[in-house]
Each structure stands twice: as structure tokens, then as C-alpha cells.
Regions:
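Anionic ligand-binding catalytic core segments
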Residues: 1-69, 73-185
Length: 185
């Protein structure tokens, strides 16, 4: 089993600012052109795009702003390439140093699709229309969003501290409203 980070695959230095759409396309291009896929390794591009965007929704919902290219990786075995399980996942928006997102959303024209805690997930889905039918991606995101509606209660039941649950930068109490504002509920 082999593991390689997004920064390593893209040959980027740590702390490099990345853009989701460009990064997704570059990763697909690199993997598609690699000798592994030409030798028959399986790589499900559609599943990869869906999982990438769902993970970013989870990062946002849980207040994990530390989404740089070392915190996402791919695994490879004898036949398949896929995203590794999520790791280094924590509510970094609660960090007093104010950890900013390293990978952000913008469309092909360079227009931001996230600003001040607002995410235009419908436009995000549209921005990936060359890779996946936007309605399919939006449906997947909506299914994930439905599971996040009662996140605060579930985190309380699991013993997450009130300091994190009530942290204003994460805003768990407002997550259902935010999901609705983002077009996911």
C-alpha cells in the first residue's frame, strides 16, 4: 500500500494556496497520464470528485479550516487508486491563531465561490460540470447536509466540549440555517 499527499502529487511546496477546481482537474490529469492508469489501475474519477467536495463540506461544517495539501492524500494498492481516509481533522477555526483555508473555491473566471463563511454550492457544482453532472453532485451534497442538521446534538452526546460547540467562528448552532442558505437543505 502506498500513500501520497496532494502537495506531493502536484509537486507543490507546503503552504501553497490551491483552488479546488484546478486541483481536482490537475490530480485527475496527473493520475490519468500516469503509467499506473495506462497499465490498468482503476481510478473512479466521478467518485473522487464527489468525495472531494463532500469532504470539503465536512471541513466547513466541523470548522476544520486546515485543509492544505498535506491533509489530503491518495492510497494505491496493486490495482486501484483512491482518496485515503480523512486524517488530521479538527475544528481549527477555534485555534487562537486563526487558521485560514488553504484550498478555496473559485470558478474558471477566478470569481470566488466562498466568501466570509458563505459558500455557493450550486455554483461549485456547476464549476465542475466538465467532470460530473452538477445535479448528481448536488444530490450527494444534499444527502450529506441532511446528516449534518443535528450535528451539535451528536457532538454533545459524544462529549465535545462546550467551548468548541459554542465557538462563534465555527457556529455549530447555525449550521442548519447555513446549509439552507448554501442551497443544500
Amino acid at each position: 500500500l502506498a500513500m501520497e499527499s496532494v502537495y506531493a502529487i502536484l509537486k507543490r511546496k507546503p503552504a501553497t494556496r490551491l483552488y479546488h477546481g484546478q486541483t481536482i482537474r490537475a490530480l485527475i490529469n496527473i493520475i490519468d497520464r500516469s503509467n499506473m492508469t495506462t497499465e490498468g489501475f482503476k481510478f473512479d474519477k466521478t467518485a473522487f470528485v464527489i468525495e472531494w467536495v463532500k469532504r470539503d463540506l465536512l471541513n466547513i461544517a466541523f470548522g476544520n479550516s486546515d485543509n492544505h495539501g498535506r491533509n489530503t492524500a491518495f492510497l494505491r494498492d496493486e490495482t486501484t487508486i483512491w482518496l485515503s481516509p480523512i486524517y488530521d481533522f479538527a475544528p481549527m477555526k477555534a485555534d487562537p491563531e486563526g487558521i485560514a483555508r488553504s484550498i478555496i473555491w473559485q470558478n474558471d473566471n477566478g470569481q470566488t465561490l466562498e466568501l466570509g463563511g458563505r459558500y455557493d454550492f450550486i455554483a461549485i457544482c456547476e464549476s465542475l460540470s466538465d467532470l460530473i453532472e452538477p445535479s448528481i453532485l448536488l444530490k450527494e451534497l444534499k444527502q450529506t447536509a441532511e446528516k449534518l442538521v443535528d450535528l451539535t446534538n451528536r457532538l454533545q452526546q459524544r462529549g465535545v466540549s462546550e467551548k468548541i460547540l459554542s465557538h462563534p467562528a465555527i457556529a455549530f448552532d447555525y449550521l442548519p440555517k447555513r446549509l439552507q442558505d448554501w442551497g443544500l437543505l
